[in-house]
Amino acid sequence: MQFIDLHKQYDVIEAKVNERIQEILAHKHFIGGAEVAELEERLAEYVGVKHVIACASGTDALTIPLMAYGVKKNDAVFVPSFTFFASGESVSLAGGTPVFVDSCRDTFNVDPKALEETIEK
């Protein structure tokens, strides 16, 4: 089932996308280049924050804040059980221990009662 017509959307922006890709290929600065800095600045302005870090993956996007927060060995980090594996993996990569907590059937978010019970264990 198609929800968004990405082909139609691309048709509208194709010339600009191709132009920018050619510029990047020409200067060969693929990682952390001027375009990444521009994206981070524009996103920071858009969401009203001082800093934005562009990430290569969702796993990086989950791991970096855990590292910045100072998660270390033996720190328990509570993670919803109904999730993608990167949610737990990122905790391990940051040095912590993922502790999975049952989710609410209606919302799929962490069940507050289950969280309380898990903390008490």
Task: Write out the residue ranges for each language-model feature.
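PLP-dependent aminotransferase-like
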Residues: 67-121
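Short alpha-helical functional segments enriched in proximate histidine and acidic residues
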Residues: 23-24, 46, 118
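Phosphate-binding glycine-rich loop
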Residues: 28-76, 90, 100-102
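N-terminal "arm"/small-domain region of PLP-dependent enzymes with the aminotransferase-like
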Residues: 1-29, 34
